[in-house]
Design a protein with these regions (language model features):
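Extended substrate/RNA-proximal surfaces in nucleic-acid metabolism proteins
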Residues: 48-137
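An N-terminally biased module of ancient metal coordination in phosphate/nucleic-acid-related enzymes
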Residues: 1-84
Length: 137
């Protein structure tokens, strides 16, 4: 069985300060065969900035990919915040970048981040779940 991790965030993401090298070294220590960096890119995140400097991202990760080629397989991906208000921008962004892997995640519904709980105020559990599932369709 191959051991892989395809969901890793680095200092390129607003939610991490870790360096890609730290992740790579830890993955090797843990015996992983393959990893994929999937830093965030959200187009309308209401709290923090989840922009992604793709030029710097690909430059740093490509250099590390070459450096570690004999020790671990490294892929370059992205976690895109799915937001139907920005679907054209998202599709253009993904098409323009040579990502090996793309995760689509819902972080925001109706300009509200639900991680911090504001999204759930005044809603039943069923109402909140319905809005989430409708956003995924």
């Amino acid at each position: 069985m191959r051991k892989i991790d395809y969901h890793m965030h680095t200092h390129f993401s607003g939610d991490s300060e870790a360096s890609p090298r730290e992740h790579i070294e830890q993955a090797i220590r843990m015996g992983l065969d393959e990893i994929c960096f999937t830093d965030h890119r959200d187009f309308d995140y209401p709290i923090d900035t989840f922009d992604l400097d793709t030029d710097a991202y690909f430059m740093e990760l490509s250099a590390l990919k070459n450096e570690y080629v004999d020790r671990i397989t490294i892929k370059i991906g992205v976690e895109v915040g799915l937001d139907m208000d920005h679907i054209d921008e998202i599709n253009t962004f993904v098409a323009q970048c040579p990502f090996d892997y793309v995760i689509g995640s819902i972080h925001v519904i109706h300009h509200t981040e639900f991680y911090y709980g504001e999204f759930f105020k005044g809603k039943t559990k069923e109402e909140a779940h319905r809005e989430f599932f409708e956003e995924t369709l």
